[in-house]
Each structure stands twice: as structure tokens, then as C-alpha cells.
Amino acid sequence: METLPIELGLLISRYTGINEITKYRTCSKNSKKYVEDVLTWFDVKCNNKVFGGLNMFANVRKLDLQECRCITNESLSALTNIETINLRSCYRITDNGLEYLSNIKEINLSGCYEITDSGLRNLNKAVFVDISNCPQITVKGIVKFGKNASIVIDNCPLIKSKHVNLLIDIELVKITRNNHPFLSYKPRHIYEKSTNNHIMTHQTKIDKPKFNIDDLKFSSDSSDSDLDAISDVSYVVGEVSDDDNSDSGSDSSSDSSDDNSDSSDDSSGKNTSKSTITKTQKATVEYANDYISKRINSKRKILFDKIYYHPINKRDDIFMKNYEDLLPNDQLNSRQESLNRLFEDKDRKNFTENLKNKSLDILIGGSMGLYCVYKNTNFKPNDIDLYIKDINLHKIKKIENAIYKSFLFDRIVVVNSPITITWYLQLKSGKITSIQLNKFNIKSWAEMFITYHTDLTCIGYEIITDRFVYMKKRWDRILTKNKHYFSCILNLDTASSIRRSCHKYAERGFNCVCINTDFKKYNQKSESDDPFYDDDDDDEPRKKKIHKKKYPKVINQLMISYYGIEEAPSSLPNRAGSLGNILDDDNFVNTLINKYKGIKNISFSSSIRHFKMEKFFPDIMMMCLYKVNKYMKYPDSSNGTEFHQFSIEKKKTYIEKTKKFFDISRSETKISHESLKIKCLECCCYIYLNHLISKYYSNIHHKFSARRDSDSSDFDDPYDSDTEYNLVCKHMLRSFSKKNHKDRCLVLSVI
């Protein structure tokens, strides 16, 4: 090829794979020089498999290395002549690496959080610089560029808006948005998962894959799990458009493809109830699943960035909209009809009014908001999900007091997990209901709704303003889309929990698709099917781990270090995610025990115990694979993926107080039985356990009120062979028999 004219060589290179070109480069010295000359005519994009060795791109003019997290300072030493480079999320790049880029004209350093003002001094010739998400850059760093360079400074905490406005007024800097055709953020497509490490722009224009119904015919030996996965992701590729910014256009165009795909899926599903998929069909579905996941992932992160870019006091005004703005609509109830649904239960209405009287800025979210405003619902939620701004102990006690004033119940169970407090109530009618308070330290509703795994539930009732609000660019999409995606992009839910939620809403009449990282449906018989399962350095036999559900190692480390707890609870084991009507007291308590048996800090009490908490609440936000204020690196990750599971201020005093937040309180609490409306509290007995549900039981702490006449002879030997649980049951039964109580006031409380 060296003897061919350069024009003909370029034409051949456009239709040749990059692997073939690089292989030809190794043939001889002449071929090496020829390939390097040819590459100067291409804009080269690299995928995240690049580990270094950029010498062959020494003469390339434009190079895209975004999210190539293994690129180091040494890798840039061969790029001294490059003019345009994209280093977005290459977090290993430091100020030393920028010394090799002194001739650069356009550069994207977004997410390179090791860069400081000193490193920017090397970019003297730059006319476009994106330093978004660089927490160490100050105003001094951007002033050096002058007004001849365009600077992008989104989400730089050390650059205050008042300083930037002043510099703009006196024309010292030129601030802009990143609309650069080569350096702006564009999510990587599925074809970049090929074995090639480098991709040339001129060769990568590939149409969306077109799925044919005939390609997804199965043989007669199919498993239900595989068929479920196929039905989830077979025809979703056309759902999302290429343009991330054209929301309305993509929605309308995707609906038509949804209708066609749904009808095709229904027609083929009748004849494929017993079949298996081939390797080609499986690869096709993996292709589709990964493609749609990347698109949704990209849009969600962009929206997340926009939320945290704005000041706290403006986030709800920008991203939360009044539900009445969508009216009239054939799919939605009027405001009065929505309120009638919300207050159709008298106890719920009283509870809402009591919260409003206490001036608590609370939002009722979850499925309750969807049920109230959406006409075509075939379900009635039996639980209430609460979110509160600026959470503290005083506000939680107000909520608890409102529960006692609003509901008349026979049994109550208080479960305090690391991220929620749940009150399970067994009412006088026998009905079971639950009230769950999320302990996220949020300042706006937008911060909470961005973590939801589906657009369906991004609506709620704001009590203090007496209106329904929804998240813009999320919930309003359900009015134009026929398919609803469930994903764990910015939350800590396991794949199995996401799939259960997906099935729950599918049973409620919605067309739902679960987007998982793995092709296989989660199966409890195989932990490897769950992408969140981690069995590294675990000598426990496989048989004992069959039903364990673990979160990623980095989450477990945080839970153990900061909260003293090994595993957080997920959804209830049943698909509906609801307790239902459990009239039997034993079943009511045992069901909750089975749900929370993975938590050690559980205690039984014979009366309602006001949980004692520290005033300092951990700043918890369920964020995965993205950052809020700081980066938290996953040390065992092969590709350097960054995690920010919990936004916690890393101060020693704060950590100590956070630990105390989840420690068990061993002080006796006096209960005023007149205010709790529970018949069984007449005995006023009190039993406290340090640990209840665990493999081995340790000490028993017996604390009884003065009204109970205890006999020392009734106490069992603490070294009795019975388990701690059995000992407590014996003591409780004896106390009840003395007072002739028919009911067992057994109450569970996680401290």
C-alpha cells in the first residue's frame, strides 16, 4: 500500500477495520510510517479497553479518549502534536500529564478531578477548555485563559457564580456551554464493545439493529426465565432516539415502534411458550438490552448533572412541575378526583391533616401518587411512602406522634433500617398498612425523584402546598410512552429487587421492561446471575449462600464501617411487595422477622418503644456510579469505576456520631400507655434484647416496669440450652398469664 497514492490509501482505509490497519503497521518500517501518515486524516475515537500505547496516534489531529480510565500521564507523552483531545472522565490524568499537551487547542477535562490551577498553565494555546466537574479548579485557573478561550465550568464547587459574573462583566473570561461537535458528551454505542480498541469516526456510522420476528423463534426446550428475558428486551432498541436532547421527538417516534413491537411480541409469544433461544438470538437480545441501558443511563446522568448544577433553592422550581399543568388529559384524573382517591381512607386523611398542622414539608410518593392521578389503575396501594426535607430527630418524632393520633391499631411494628423507618400497623379492622419514611437528607424533591428506578412513580402529593407535583422529563413521559423501563442506574437496589418491582407494576396493568446488567433472569439458585452478588474471599460453602443477597463490596464496606450493619433489607419476598391482610398475630410478626432477619440490631419489646436516635443524621443519597460532591473509588475495580454510594462528610467527629446513630440504645424508656391506644399495654412490661435474629444468641436484658410483680424464681438460668428467642417468649408468656391477657403484644423494633 505504500506505493499507492495517498488518496487511494485513504479510500481503502475507510473500508478497512482498525485492527487490520494496526496489524499492517507491524509489517515493516515503511508500513508503520504509512499507517501513521494515514491516521492523520482521521478523527479517532477509543473505547474503554485502551490501556495505553498511544504512540501510533502521535500524528492524529483529533483523538477521543473519554471514559478511557486506564489512560495515565505517561500515555499522553506520545501526543505532543495533537490539536483536539477529549479526556472526559480520565481521572488518572494529573497536572504532570498536561505538560505534554502544551500545543493543544481544544480539550475536554471534565471529571479529571486531580487537575489543579497549576496544570492549566500548560494549556497556553487552548481556545476551548471544558473543566466541568473538576473540584480543585478555582477562579485563578480560568483567568489565565483570558477572553480568547471559551471555558466550560459546570459543577466546579470552588468557582463561585458571583466571581464568574464579575469576570464576565469586565470581559476577563468567556464562559460557554459544551456544544462542541467533537468534545461534547455523547454516550458510547453498543458497537464499541467489539474487540477493537480504537475506532475511527469515518468507519463507525452503523444503523440501529433491526429485529425480525423470524429471528426470535425458539425450539421446544425453553426455560421460563429465558423467555421472560426475551419478552423484556427483544424489541426495545428502537425505543430511544440517537439525539439525547430531542426528548419530544424521540418519545413520539418511539411510540410507533412500541406498538409494532408489542403486537409482534404478543403474536409470537403464543407459539413460543416452550422453546429455547439460540446463541445468535441470545446475542441479539444482549445487544438490545445493553443498547437501551446505555441510552437510558446517559439521559438519567445528564438530568442528574443538571439538577446538582443549580442552587438548592431553585431545583424544585426548575425540575418539579404542578400536576394541574397537564390537565385536561384523558389519561389523568382532575385535581378533585385525585384528592378524593388520596383521602378515600379516613385514617389516611386524618394522618395527612395532622402532618400539615405540624408544618412538616413532606411529600407522599411511591405508588400512592400514581394511583391518585392516573385513571387506568387496577390497584389500591396499602402503604404510604413519605419523604421529608432537612430531616432531623424532632421532625421524626412529630411524624410518629401524628401516626398515634391518626390510626387506631392493635399491633404496631417499628423497623428502623439504615435508610428507612417503617411503621407497620395492624388496625382494629384486621387490615395491615405501613408507613415508610425515607431517611434521605434531601433539600429538594428533584434530588429524590432522580434516584427512582422508573418514571412511573416520579409524582407525589406535597402536603404543605396541597398539590400534586411531578418530575419534569420523567413522569410526564408516561403519557406518551407505552413502555416503562426499570433500572438501577442511580440507586442501590439489587437486580432481583428491580425485577420484582417491574413484575409488580406489570401485574398492575403497565407495560414494563426490566433493564439489568446481565442477560439471565435473577435466579436464587445461582448467585452469579445477580450482578450485585460478590463472593470474593468467602470460604462459606455454596449451599449456605444460595439464598443470600449481597450488595457490591464497596457498599458492604460502607455499611459495616459507618453503620455497623452487614446487609440492608430489600423488598418483601412476595412479588406484590405488600403484607396483605394478615389477621394472625403470629404471622404478622413472623413475616416481618423473616424479612429483616439479615439485620443484627433487632429487639423485641412488649410495648411501643420510642426509638432513641442521635441528632446527626447521615447524609444518605442512593447514588451509584456517579458523584455528588466527592468521588469514592472502588479499589477492586479492574477499570477504575468510580462509586459514590453515600454522600458522607468524611470528618472523624461526624463518623463517630453517625456510628452512634445505628448503635443500640441500652437505656430504659418509659412508655405512657394512655397515649398509645393499645389494650395490651395494661401490663406495662418491658423486655429488651440486644440481638434477636442472628446465628448465635448472647445476653438477655430484662427490664420490667414497676407495675409488674416479678418473681425471681420465674427467671430461667441464663446459661440454659434454649435459644435467646425461646427464653424471651417464655418470660413474656408468663407475664401475660399473670395478668390474664389473651393477646400477645409482641413488638419488633430495629434500633
Swiss-Prot record:
Stretches forming LRR repeats: 79-104, 105-126, 129-148
Keywords: Leucine-rich repeat, Repeat
SUPFAM superfamilies named in the record: RNI-like (SSF52047)
Pfam families: LRR_6 (PF13516)
TM stretches of this protein: none
GO cellular component, one term: SCF ubiquitin ligase complex
Acidic residues bias: start-end ranges: 256-265, 529-539
The protein's name: Putative F-box/LRR-repeat protein R753
Top-level taxon of origin: Viruses
Span list, region Disordered: 239-278, 527-546
InterPro entries (UniProt xref): Leu-rich_rpt, Leu-rich_rpt_Cys-con_subtyp, LRR_dom_sf
Biological process, per Gene Ontology: SCF-dependent proteasomal ubiquitin-dependent protein catabolic process
Residues annotated as domain F-box: 1-44
